[in-house]
Amino acid sequence: MLTKKPVLSPDRCFSPEPVQRRLAHQFFDSISALPLVCPHGHVDPALLANPAARFGSPTELFIIPDHYILRMLYSRGVPLEALGIPTRDAPTETDHRKIWQLFAEHFYLFQGTPSGLWLKDELTNVFGVDEALNSRNAGRIYDYLEGLLALPKFSPRALFKRFNIEVLCTTDAASDNLENQRSLHEEGFTQIRPTFRPDAVVNLDAPGWRENLTKLESSIGREISSYATFVQALEERRAFFKKMGATATDQGAATPYTTSLSDQEAEAIFARALIGKLNPGDVEQFTGHIFMEMARMSVEDGLVMQMHCGVMRNHNPALFERFGSDKGADIPLNIEWTRNLHPLLSSYGNNQRFRLIIFGMDESTYSREMAPLAGHYPTILLGPPWWFHDSVNGMERYFNQVMETAGIYNTAGFNDDTRAFVSIPARHNVWRRVACNWLAGLVTRGLVDEEEGYDMARALAYDLAKSAYKLD
Amino acid sequence: MLTKKPVLSPDRCFSPEPVQRRLAHQFFDSISALPLVCPHGHVDPALLANPAARFGSPTELFIIPDHYILRMLYSRGVPLEALGIPTRDAPTETDHRKIWQLFAEHFYLFQGTPSGLWLKDELTNVFGVDEALNSRNAGRIYDYLEGLLALPKFSPRALFKRFNIEVLCTTDAASDNLENQRSLHEEGFTQIRPTFRPDAVVNLDAPGWRENLTKLESSIGREISSYATFVQALEERRAFFKKMGATATDQGAATPYTTSLSDQEAEAIFARALIGKLNPGDVEQFTGHIFMEMARMSVEDGLVMQMHCGVMRNHNPALFERFGSDKGADIPLNIEWTRNLHPLLSSYGNNQRFRLIIFGMDESTYSREMAPLAGHYPTILLGPPWWFHDSVNGMERYFNQVMETAGIYNTAGFNDDTRAFVSIPARHNVWRRVACNWLAGLVTRGLVDEEEGYDMARALAYDLAKSAYKLD
Amino acid sequence: MLTKKPVLSPDRCFSPEPVQRRLAHQFFDSISALPLVCPHGHVDPALLANPAARFGSPTELFIIPDHYILRMLYSRGVPLEALGIPTRDAPTETDHRKIWQLFAEHFYLFQGTPSGLWLKDELTNVFGVDEALNSRNAGRIYDYLEGLLALPKFSPRALFKRFNIEVLCTTDAASDNLENQRSLHEEGFTQIRPTFRPDAVVNLDAPGWRENLTKLESSIGREISSYATFVQALEERRAFFKKMGATATDQGAATPYTTSLSDQEAEAIFARALIGKLNPGDVEQFTGHIFMEMARMSVEDGLVMQMHCGVMRNHNPALFERFGSDKGADIPLNIEWTRNLHPLLSSYGNNQRFRLIIFGMDESTYSREMAPLAGHYPTILLGPPWWFHDSVNGMERYFNQVMETAGIYNTAGFNDDTRAFVSIPARHNVWRRVACNWLAGLVTRGLVDEEEGYDMARALAYDLAKSAYKLD
């Protein structure tokens, strides 16, 4: 496979201005060989725990599990059934080569999007495809990829080594037995660590909450019939996760509202949840209270606390009923941090044992609330641009709106936050390039010295993520 | 009239970086001759229906009807009376040459604004004025323009042909008899189409609501004494508009709140409106319900639905009382789409017969709500940057904040949304230039191939608007 | 002290694109010698009133009073005690050379921040330090600065002359006797003017409200036992401030909510405040009403009204209890202008005797609300980017989001809003550079003529601030 012009420009993400571009290359060259630190993501640990695991067909690797791909195709009229997504009650396409062809015919939809950039990078740098995917070469490329994916050197484990990943944190339910991590550790893969994510039991409106609680009961080996027992369960599970290598927790909620309920109030809400008779406001009050409790536990056990806020999950009820969650139908919400975090920060904001990393998709809060909070409280770090904003422009907005107030050292560097294992190097590549180009812009504008630029590039590419998540 | 340096730079809107600028020119050259598609605007069809129509004096063309011009002059202390705006009760300036002189003396206020750019383009490219307007040459330029405007080749019809407008959609009240469109169609001008805009009757707080309803009654030839009849009236009028060539409807509201009222609730509110005794919240509830009804009708008759949300009309009560609406005193509001559109999208968001184009002036919702919604729902397209944001920076923000998530193919291309007929080419010119410069930036940054750039330029300049409004 | 490369780039804040950069230099050269107009700030007039006043140690000058510096160091774990901040009850570091060393060791935190840029400028241009501060040279630089600061030519008065400040407005409590200004005026320093800031008495939840009221009583020489007397007191004090050279007032509040209470309502709230029994909402209602009253008084006495809105003061209660206000723990809030200012603008928005300058830190309101309001009402001007946004990117966002709608002539130019006297030239330098670079961008993009660029540069650097505050 040969073409004249590379599919993937060596200058990608860099300013066309020659002096800035040259400097961006220099910064990038100085950090591009650093290992990848992946402190927050959603890779299935089973992929790595089982040496015989394979990615399946190109369609199983690139299309079916990727909600960014699904949503864009769906938005232009491609039914999810035609993409092989399992439905509750109807047949779905099973010919993966045909799905791939359909995808290739619509690949133009991803022009200028991060998904398009990642995919080009993966095809080029992971699989050696050196032509742009289109409807004519789709079948040929499919066959080529299918051949490679069957080879041991394209197994998840082999790629894990090739990707130079120094540490990879997974995200795991509070009730998870972490068997995959255990077996990986026994094999020496201690750099794969769990993260404690209790959303399924602490958000009282989570789908299947009662079943999730039952799983939590199983994990601690006793019944959870009161709020007090529930909190004990969380504490026990955190201790277990920590023993299994976790350094952090994570929680998602529609809003970063925090509040401190009395024990009686918390017990009353929990009791109503158990009998399935929640009052209006119970969900928000309980989640807001658990944020406080999780902060308290972080002070006690030293796990870094993460908050991901501001998404309305499953916005499309018909799609959710038919195909379930994570099909690209989650839509961000506007949020407010200054007032909502006030109770939590009043209690724990100055505590040297506490660390909180916050993520949101309301970019209007970057310069107004997030950077000022991180630029004052010793306990707060800012997570990188999240989800829809994990893109060239999204990162540039983040740098330009956050860094003047918070400085880079109040951020947590980068994390890829992905379940698409093969996209990890591509995502870090974009971050590192955009960061280096931003720094080159600061230097060419006389705002930062060249020497400082090299230090900052390394911090953004590597050091900050490690130290933020206590991985050093 | 000769000057050395052109008033209008051939490089306008393009980056000074030479490589990007060259490519922007190439993209622009490839699309600049494409016809103009104008699927949403406010040109008075009478201007075109009457072959003898003229624009009047330069002041009547450029100043008196342009609320962008009026608001800026008013904001710096120029009374609207001095600009010839009719008042309810007092004399107003009638010497148009004097008004033009006053305008020229204040023309520096428009430095760096879109109004300034449009006006320079119109003077140069429509009228051949090749010097910058100022207080010294104002009278001379006035006389020159006055001479031209009397000529048949500067009649609205002549300019319509010269402007290479492929289709022009007007905006018309629900009760409009569309006589102008009818006579235009009979003359062969079938490319001039109406748009169904029922704001005056569906927004129960619209000025003169009762009179507007009376007109609607006349248009259907019977009394509207109930909500049920009202809905029938809307359906009948939509059918009439569709027969007269309409492909779309439009609605404006302070908020995109949608809700489904029961028939009894809707009847009760409508009954209160008829007797002029609305309860608090009635207006918002009724408009929110009508949004749902308009979506249902769109599913049935195939008209594209448009929503323009987030403006407080007539913010300045003293000005409104004296001079009426549309004098530059409408101020945008913050809005929310994710929760507000949820009811409507839950009902119609996946319906293949439905199409919804949304517009807002709360740019914080571009990346947070609008692009994610359009990047998921097959029914949603994003309208171009609207009103105050129909500008070089406004468009760049739109491209940078929308396209990574929604891609360009979930947008409706450009529309000029103007009542200033003569400004139409200038407005499309700015859009096409900014789009080409943005694409050149993507190519020089290695994010899009040059070949893709040409395709995207054509789509943004022409194809997307046609297909979004079902004009192809 | 000699190094090869200057610490402060002569190209700082300018685009690396050569044509734009050259033009930016030309614009900057044309305005850099203009005097500084400082119509809003917080310099202590005692510094200037007393010819023998000195700045103290380098630590007293640069660190202890600067809440930008304090918050960043605190955010990375440096205790305020170690920085010499007085606490209510515990010892604090008193060795200023040691504090300076600690600061230098953490100076990398300010990379790319406005504080870092200002400090480099001050060290270079005010004190002639020509090397970058670091942990190794910290002691040497401290000694050097300490030596200079003892010299008469580095007294506040000497620097005032050297800085070429044409006018400097201070900010003073309503009860202030303005003795410093009086003595300055007697010495001929009439360019130092007070500003009337009644927050401490009109915001009923201001710390020490009762004591503040007592001071106000003293200043007018009689008791304030009713709302009516309170309003009279404000009027009397405004008259006194005006006599002492004030041309403006200023008010800060969490929100720009305005409302008109009846006399009875206002009296009732004031009576509750006097007995310390406020109802929920009283504070916001009263402040909102006083905004209206202050506007009325501005119409009567011609003082320019300023509103600074959208900050939650003292967000960190533990820090506040220990160290008091203004230690970097104020966090911005989202705000709304369109609805909140509606009552005030309905009453005074068209009044030729009224002028209102508004400031906020919610940048999402720049293009959505602030620019449209200023681009319509003849009474509104926009203040420059404030507080956290007084930075290179903050200014660029302001220019790009405000100017297309409001034009530059509806803004109030620049003010430094600082209590750090020595940083004044550095802050104006950043504004002037960013403005010139922005204008050079407009010219090189063909949006503004070069000649217009020179006019606009002068307006932004000098004229607008003078005329906005009636200082011409």
Swiss-Prot record, chains A, B, C:
The gene is uxaC. Belongs to the metallo-dependent hydrolases superfamily. Uronate isomerase family. This is Uronate isomerase. It catalyses: D-glucuronate = D-fructuronate; aldehydo-D-galacturonate = keto-D-tagaturonate. GO terms for biological process: D-galacturonate catabolic process; D-glucuronate catabolic process. InterPro entries: Metal_Hydrolase (IPR032466), Uronate_isomerase (IPR003766). Its EC number is 5.3.1.12. One of its GO terms (molecular function) is glucuronate isomerase activity. Keywords: Isomerase. Pathway: Carbohydrate metabolism; pentose and glucuronate interconversion.
